[in-house]
Regions:
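C-terminal beta-strand-loop-alpha-helix "lid" module of Rossmann-like NAD(P)-dependent dehydrogenases
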Residues: 1-240
Length: 240
């Protein structure tokens, strides 16, 4: 009976059928993730552009989210996957962070995805947080929770900078590793040029305080956008 079962499992074509089934599942997941990423991207881009525009016209606002708080520690939110067999998807993100120029001893990894966390542990990085289950089915509330963790650490002076590393989704075959700085918020070069050519806007104290609400929403939106782009990119990588 065991011999017959072994023979049956190795029949020509059986493996091909399984491979085709798995590819079909991956195709469906990719289509769903791609639709989600493409439909959400304009919103997150608008949020980013809005914050950049406000800051470029604001003059010199003194706010904790815009200035260095004295801590040399760097929080890096790293988005990878929980599974391998995705080409260079996971390794590219790990390498991007390792080659970023941030001193290893100053970096605290907020890991989303077991593969990335395992790689950073082998390299001797400090893992501040492991929220790997999030990437299976990421929700906006998950992004809010990660945002809360890093913002609380920033407000307490435990970290001085916040970065985000993930794989950006361009299309089904083009996925680009991204490494961006979230805090302190920096004005893009082109926005900075525009800022110098315009008279600064006058802000009342209440308006400056509104950054307490705006910046966390901005951070949460960028993190969630990274989650859904990463999921689409991962599924795309598995199809190649």
């Amino acid at each position: 009976l065991c011999v017959n079962r072994l023979w049956t499992n190795t029949l020509p074509g059986r493996g091909n059928t399984w491979a085709k089934a798995m590819k079909l599942v991956s195709t469906v997941k990719l289509q769903k993730a791609r639709t989600r990423a493409e439909s959400a991207k304009p919103y997150f881009q608008k949020m980013y552009d809005t914050v950049q525009s406000i800051l470029s016209k604001s003059g010199n606002i003194e706010h904790p989210y815009l200035t260095f708080n004295g801590s040399e520690k760097k929080a890096v939110i790293v988005v990878t996957s929980n599974r391998g067999l995705a080409g260079g998807y996971n390794n590219n993100i790990v390498k991007l962070v390792a080659d970023s120029g941030l001193p290893k001893e100053s970096v605290e990894i907020y890991g989303i995805g077991k593969k990335g966390i395992e790689s950073f542990e082998r390299r001797g990085y400090y893992i501040a947080s492991d929220d790997s289950d999030i990437i299976n089915e990421p929700l906006f509330s998950d992004a809010v929770e990660i945002g809360r963790k890093v913002l609380d650490a920033y407000a307490a002076g435990e970290i001085g900078e916040i970065y985000l590393a993930y794989t950006g989704f361009k299309n089904t075959v083009v996925h680009t590793p991204e490494f961006i700085k979230l805090l302190p918020v920096e004005v893009k070069a082109e926005e900075e040029s525009e800022k110098k050519s315009q008279a600064p806007m006058n802000y009342e104290p209440e308006a400056e305080e509104s950054l307490d609400l705006l910046i966390p929403k901005y951070i949460n939106s960028i993190i969630y956008g990274a989650f859904i782009e990463a999921v689409a990119s991962e599924n795309g990588a598995r199809m190649q």
